[in-house]
Amino acid sequence: YFYAIEYIVNRFLDKTKYERHNKYLQELYIPNPPTDIQQQIVTEIEQVVNAAALLTQQIKQKENEIENLLSSIQYGDDSLKTIAPFATKSIKYFEIESETYITTDNMLQNKLGIVPFEGEANISSITEYKKDDILISNIRPYLKKIWFADKDGGCSKDVLVLRSADTNKYLPKYIFYMLRRDVFFDYVMEGKKGIKMPRGNKEDILKYRIPIPSIDEQMRIVSQIEALESEITKARNLIENTASEKQTILDKYL
């Protein structure tokens, strides 16, 4: 009955109230189709669940391929202070489109980018960012919030903006991939300030070193990773559709 209960919860319960309380559950009607229909529901939904599990494994495999590629790079290194120092130009909030505003709140955990900002920010001064900049949340670095800017905009002061010092020598996307690694966030956490709300130490962050191959090699590496990223994105999109696929099956039989 798990899938039937899931169907009821998702379709009929008011999510604004705590309706999983016993008094509501006692009044719930749970469909009880014939056994053969129940078995068909289970079979079809398990196919969806198993497909999602396989996609999750594929994502992990592709992520490991990316990490193995990046960890195998053996070239002379340099510090972020030289490669991609902080961009710190302050601008006014009214100078940007509100949907381009980035805060720690609309940055997603585990390196998943951002979601659009909604509403109006109660703030005047923000930090300008440009397309191809790298934005990193400096609050609770262990949440691993990082984004490669695909547009111009502004961000809160709790978001660090790193910009390639010379795009002819340091490819922005290459820098981004080198910083989007667990090893970088582990490094930031080692030098953190504060306990309850830890922040990265900006001076230490600028000391972080990454290997710098030729610009042609950087482009080749980025191209390889982007191909893997494309496969990961496709798999994630399919996983996101899992809930609606399960609901379609339940709607068909219940």
Q: Which positions does each model-derived feature cover?
A:
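A generic structural signal for residues embedded in beta-strands
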Residues: 136-137
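Short, well-ordered loop/turn elements at secondary-structure boundaries
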Residues: 24, 129-131, 155
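Short glycine-/small-residue-rich Rossmann-like dinucleotide-binding loops
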Residues: 140
